[in-house]
Amino acid sequence: MMNIRTLKLTNLGRFEELDVHLAPVEEFKSNVTVFIGNNGAGKTSILKSLATSLSWFVARVRTEKGNGSLIPEDAILNGRSSATIELQVLNTHPATEAATPYRWLLARTASGKKSTTASSLQEASQLAAFYRDQYTQNSGASFPL
């Protein structure tokens, strides 16, 4: 089972820096995270960023070197040279119940700007390889939704 623990956005959408801790968290043991805000507050930016980051995991489950969606250039915060999405997940092994953390970072630099951050997708690839191995051994294996 895979649980998304944190999502960090830097210079993306309207956020200079945003850390979102998804349920469950220490204070609240609920399994539900709710985003509430006025129009234009950034709820859609958060969800699109989550989908963009997870698209790399899904693509690498399908094929070893698969490519997911890129951060759109127009999503980079005005006046900034780059934007990043960092995702941290916790994957629990079905047989051993051992929980392993994984983290990956997706970066986008604006055209004509110097790159300051690079994407780091090694752990997304490792997690995808784990699920490909599980599926190879058992075609009825479960995948995270």
Question: Each PLM stretch: what is its role?
Answer:
Residues 47-116:
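Conserved P-loop NTP-binding catalytic core
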Residues 16-17, 27, 64, 73-74, ...:
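Glutamate identity and glutamate-enriched acidic tracts
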Residues 4-9, 43, 71-75, 126-140:
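Intrinsically disordered, low-complexity boundary segments flanking structured domains
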Residues 95-145:
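Glycine-rich phosphate-binding loops of NTPases
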Residues 1-51:
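Pre-Walker A-like glycine/lysine-rich segment at the N-terminus of P-loop NTPase domains
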Residues 7, 33, 83-85, 144:
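A broad, low-specificity signal marking well-ordered, structured residues that form hydrophobic/aromatic
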Residues 1-3, 88-90, 145:
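Extended helical coiled-coil dimerization/tether regions that scaffold
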Residues 9-12, 30, 58-65, 115-134:
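Short linear motifs at secondary-structure transitions and domain/linker junctions
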